[in-house]
Curated annotation (Swiss-Prot):
Name of the protein in question: Cardiolipin synthase
InterPro entries named among the record's database cross-references: Cardiolipin_synth_Firmi, Cardiolipin_synthase, CLS_N, PLD-like_dom, PLipase_D/transphosphatidylase
Membrane topology annotation: Multi-pass membrane protein
GO cellular component terms, semicolon-separated: plasma membrane
Organism: Clostridium perfringens (strain ATCC 13124 / DSM 756 / JCM 1290 / NCIMB 6125 / NCTC 8237 / Type A)
Gene: cls
Catalyzed chemical reaction(s): 2 a 1,2-diacyl-sn-glycero-3-phospho-(1'-sn-glycerol) = a cardiolipin + glycerol
SMART domains in UniProt: PLDc
Nucleotidyltransferase found in the keyword field: no
Catalytic center residues: H212, K214, D219, H394, K396, D401
Keyword check for Lipid metabolism: yes
Enzyme class of the recorded protein, top EC level: transferase
Enzyme Commission number: 2.7.8.-
Domain PLD phosphodiesterase positions: 207-234, 389-416
């Protein structure tokens, strides 16, 4: 036993040397790994093997990065592009950054609806699936074979039998679809793929990199993107969670092209195939007479561990820094890195009304403890923090100055910014932003406000626990 522990300790020393001198991570993450590998050697060893290897990360994504670049050039020939030099807008710098970081096209001929509950969203999804004539492309983190999951699978299977192209891509960890349901879909002519499959569901050396996207695209006429996964719990049927509060979008118009491009790249990678299909049918002609008459500026921005730039984080950062009057944020998990935390503090210190809403009852208790460790710094700067008490808050939204907002799959945490595959829509429109604000203030009615006075009264044990877990927060 002593020999085993000594071997683990020596291997951990090699890991630490690699982290410091080869991987050259940021100081926060480096210290977190040093602490856990030194003081919890066996646990640290296991966690590092599963979650920590940047060298393995580079190996995993080297082919994907090269393939995506090649395929992206091909996809661009089918997408609508605008000359950004001619755009004169309040947020031109953000638009330019998103374009340069993620090749994200700025489009205006869009119509966007917001959904704040799963009942209406799932009804709309099924209705649109039933109207499909050419193709249905679906990419989700969690997909369950429960009541609502089976309804959607039945709708997909029915369309596949009718000759509609059906492609369903799910994450290997989030997938809970029964094999018999998958077999029915395949027998009907549908196609099903798992993103980053492992030896078995929970033995996967790539477990750290999750496809957290929630995308549905139908005939390039309509698309859905947001925070809802597929399962009964999102309808509030899980008694342990209760009401599920989330935000999702329904998109019509040219913004769908970038979302379709994102799906095709992910599908191609999971399928280990080239884009050797007729792509014209997947993209909207920018000169089509069927485009929405509304003018709603939008960009689809995606990020993941296969990129050196943290695109969605950078977009959030620009929105925070641009805010002049108010900034309203909803996120289920709050683990900002130091630059993001400082940006929020500086916004509050500058007189911006910064309101951050988090779950009062986190689904993972330790994530609540980590979030708590950032409260004092924000409260001292003048930011306001609210805990949502009516069930579970899962929305991932940010709104600034009633003029710009972002909705999608990315939480405001280090994992979403650097380790998960995420997609958000950035919306440059006052009407949509005000609708988001209205919902934020509705949610405030069922929130408890965290005050500095009440927060300082927490127990010594809570303070010690928060301080300890804060040390490893960069790994969460």
């Amino acid at each position: 036993m002593h020999l085993f522990i000594n071997m683990i300790f020596l291997i951990n020393i090699v890991f630490i040397i690699s982290i410091i001198f080869i991987e050259r991570r940021n100081p926060q993450t480096t210290w977190a790994w040093i602490l856990i590998l030194t003081f919890l050697p066996i646990l640290g060893f296991i966690i590092y093997i599963l979650f920590g290897q940047n060298i393995t990360r580079e190996k995993n994504f080297k082919r994907k990065i090269l393939d995506d670049k090649t395929k992206q050039k091909y996809l661009n020939s089918f997408k609508s592009h605008y000359k950004l030099d001619n755009i004169s807008l309040k947020y031109k710098d953000l638009i330019m950054m998103n374009f340069n970081n993620d090749n994200s096209t700025y489009t205006q001929r869009n119509d966007i609806d917001l959904y704040f509950d799963a009942n209406s969203l799932f009804e709309e999804m099924i209705d649109e699936i039933n109207k499909a004539e050419k193709f249905i492309h679906m990419e989700f983190y969690i997909f369950k074979s429960d009541e609502i999951g089976k309804k959607i699978l039945q709708a997909l299977t029915k369309k596949a039998k009718e000759g509609v192209e059906v492609k369903l891509l799910v994450d290997s960890i989030g997938n809970s679809i029964h094999k018999k349901d998958i077999d029915k879909l395949k027998a009907a002519g549908g196609d099903f793929k798992i993103f980053f499959p492992g030896f078995c569901k929970y033995i996967n050396l790539r477990i750290n990199y999750r496809n957290h996207r929630k995308i549905l695209i139908i005939d390039s006429k309509v698309a859905f993107l947001g925070g809802f996964n597929i399962g009964d719990e999102y309808l509030g049927k899980d008694k342990n969670i209760g009401h599920w509060r989330d935000t999702h979008t329904k998109i019509k118009g040219l913004a769908i092209n970038d979302l379709e491009g994102r799906f095709l790249l992910d599908w191609s990678y999971a399928n280990e195939s080239d884009l050797d299909i007729d792509l014209k049918k997947y993209f909207i002609n920018p000169h089509s007479t069927d485009l929405p008459k509304k003018i709603i500026g939008a960009q689809i921005v995606s990020s993941g561990p296969d990129h050196t730039e943290q695109q969605i984080k950078n977009g959030y950062f620009k929105i925070i820094n641009s805010a002049k009057k108010n900034l309203f944020i909803q996120t289920p998990y709050f683990v900002p890195d130091e630059p993001m935390l400082e940006a929020l503090r500086l916004a509050a210190l500058s007189g911006v009304d910064v309101k951050i809403m988090l779950p009062g009852n986190p689904d993972h208790k330790f994530m609540g403890w980590i979030a708590n460790s950032y409260f004092e710094s924000l409260l001292n700067a003048g930011a306001k923090i609210y805990l949502y008490e009516k069930g579970f808050l899962h929305a991932k939204t940010i709104v600034a100055d009633s003029s710009i907002c972002s909705v999608g799959t990315a939480n405001m945490d280090i994992r979403s910014f650097s380790l998960n595959f995420e997609s958000n829509i950035f919306i440059y429109n006052e009407a949509i932003s005000k609708s988001m604000e209205e919902q934020f203030f509705k949610d405030l009615k069922v929130c408890t406000k965290v005050t500095l006075e009440s927060f300082e009264k927490r127990s010594i044990i809570s303070r010690i626990g928060e301080s300890i877990i804060r040390l490893v927060s960069p790994l969460m």
